[in-house]
Amino acid sequence: IYPRERDYDEFTSNQDNLWKYPDWYEGLKDKAKEQELWNLFLPKEYAPWSPGLNNLEIAGLFETMSKAAWSQQIFNCNAPDRGNMEVLAKYGTPEQQEQWLKPLLAGEIRSAYAMTEPDVASSDATNMELEITRDGDEYILNGKKWWTTNVVTPKCKFMLVMGKSNPENSRHQQHSTIIVPTDAEGFEITRALRAFGEYHSPGGEGDVVFKNVRVPVTNLILGEGKGFEIAQGRLGPGRFQYAMMFVGMAQRALELMCERAQNRVAFGEPFSKKTSVQHEIARSRCDIEQCRLLVLASAEKMDKYGIDAARDYISMLKIVAPKMCEDVSSRAIQIFGGMGVCQDTPLAHIFTTSRFCRIADGPDEVHMSQHAKLTMRSLSV
């Protein structure tokens, strides 16, 4: 993958190639399949869809697979597909699994997850306005979503959409999750969004509208009013996997930082001799190792006691990991100077991805408030 990094960046940054993949891309995926490095992210409780690894075993693999920005796609463990596969493996009917899960696991299609909305504060996961109304053997969807990752690429064939189906219920039982094919009549991508000025092609984030979109009732996942339960089940493991990704990206930034410090000379000596640079390297190593150990502790807790028992650790990871990666990549950029902010290194992408993810799947502040409550409850304060 490393030898192809520059090729990939040059191809995807060319506006003529928007939403396309390089010709050689599928060949790398075939190699991953041949070497049995495919779908490793599904832990063994997702049998028969899992290769049989536990979360602790997955953690180190996922860290390594995340060192190149786009490499997760080569191993079929990229978001939001991996989260959607987990949902379908855990909650999907046999028919839903046959139609949607199997092609995802084979890497034949891609998918999106439509949760965030433009007209409400999405830091509240129950705060949604998209309506899901039953009409005989169909559900009708009306509303807007945005920051719908993957939806722009032609390979995206369906979305998991969360909306309000039962407003009469209590707050956490008002929403449902339903499968919507991207070719459904009434569904429209109104624009592709730029994150830090970039389209994130070939996946992309979309601003989308549902106008009387009809889907069969068999597309509903788990049942009416189960949307929040599904979202929490999906986002919990997703945050753990994001944390492993950030450890991998930060480790890559540290490796590049050390290489630069040893090889770059200023005022008659290598950067590595400068006390300020040494301190930045040491601080970065400490930050990465602390986060890595928290990832491993979270994985062990999930394996022993389940995801629900590990929610406090997963919450800590969502707070710590993106900020850690942002800080490490920022230090590396400072040592690289102008090269650090251009396309000649992956550092700019690492920095913007980690900054973006301090908002995605819930902002830092929400997780810190929630974690404070969990902490006080555990200490009986």
Description of each model-found segment:
Residues 127, 183-214:
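Flexible, small-/acidic-enriched active-site or ligand-binding loops
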Residues 119-123, 150-154, 167-169, 196-204:
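Short Gly/Pro-enriched turn/cap motifs at secondary-structure boundaries
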Residues 1-69, 77-79, 91-96, 103-108, ...:
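Alpha-helical interface subdomain recognition
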Residues 49-50, 122, 189, 219-224:
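Cytochrome P450 core scaffold surrounding the K-helix E-X-X-R motif
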Residues 85-91, 113-114, 168:
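Flexible, glycine-rich active-site loops centered on histidine and acidic residues
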Residues 112, 129-131, 138, 158-162, ...:
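Conserved hydrophobic/aromatic beta-strand scaffold that supports enzyme active sites
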Residues 137-138, 142-190:
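A short core secondary-structure module
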Residues 107-116:
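A short, Trp-centered hydrophobic/proline-enriched beta-strand micro-motif
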